[in-house]
Amino acid sequence: MSIRIATLFSLAAVAALAASPALAAPYQKDDTYKNPAIKAGGSLDLTNLVGHVSVVAASDGVLAVDSHIVAAAGNDADAQTLAGKLKIETKVDGNAVEMMAKYPLDDYSTYYYHDKGFDGFGMNNTTTDYDGERVRISSGSFGSGANLHVDFVVHVPKGVHVTVDNKVGLIESAGVDAPQNLKSSSGDIKSDHGSDSFEAHTGSGDVTVSDQAGGVDMETGSGDITLSRQKGGDVKVETGSGDVKLHDIAGGIHGETGSGDVELRGATGSGADLETGSGDIVLDNVTGSLKLRAGSGDIRGTDLKAGQVVETNTGSGDVTLSGDLGDVVRLSADSGSGSIVIHTKRVPSMHISATSDSGDVDVDLPGMQNVSVRHHSFRADVNGGKGSAELEAGSGDVTFTKD
């Protein structure tokens, strides 16, 4: 479990920073671990407290891990001594490798990481469990603690399952043809042109994936999620607070945010199950069954090629759907406060029930039978009435027409 606290800079912090002793040039130590015996079906498990981890394809087919230890102190000798206290522990068991960066936790419980990706001036504090100890990391343009970290470049052969747990810092992956599980307590995770299954979980940070051939599971406690050009498996994405953007997706989709907008553009899979506690849901050029829920926000879908089920619900907002709903057998749209507008190119076979507590109801479809019109309500069968449509607006108009 980790806690991340964003700390704004102050005049006092600037003064303290200016008064602190100047650090010598960082001492850097490089090493490479190679194991040609690890083949497809094997695994690598890498754990690091703080730093930047890159995961790339092994061009020569050999598992290799490059480590780059960086330490800074008041003088070169102290920096070299500090760097020497960080060890890389490696365990091999058959076709599996475990590597862990062993920090001098008996000497230091607080570390500073000059995060080059930090936006602006200030720092973040992350408290996390590592190697059986409680550790605090200050990251940003300034901070306090032992100035010590290690960066890794992991060269992954095809089919070797890689797990990275990098508590603080960026994780990047590019061109890897293997299952991946990337985890961070506080840091962004990025991947492009990967194959096989992909998992990414961060406590705080953005997750961005593009050109992925395989199933995807992405989660962040606080941050945006972006996935583009995915095929070959289902998609699960979740953020506690942040936007979700999905473009050109081939798999079935489950997406959720506690607070933020959800955008899905271009989907050819079995359908989408999307939810936001507070925000809009926007779909364009989407195929399959749909379950869309917004606690507070609009639901808008255009150029839909709907499957058998379309369910939409918003506590406060409009529901607007257009496209081909001809294959739908169960349609429901519910808005506590807002209008419902549905336009379809093909008319489905269904019994329609449309009501509004305080608004107009306009259903105009060809071939309607058994029509019943009452104050703020409408019922009818269309195309044989095999399926059902339940349209209900607490406050707003209801419209259902053929384009």
Where do the model's predicted regions map?
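Intrinsically disordered, low-complexity terminal regions
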Residues: 1-403
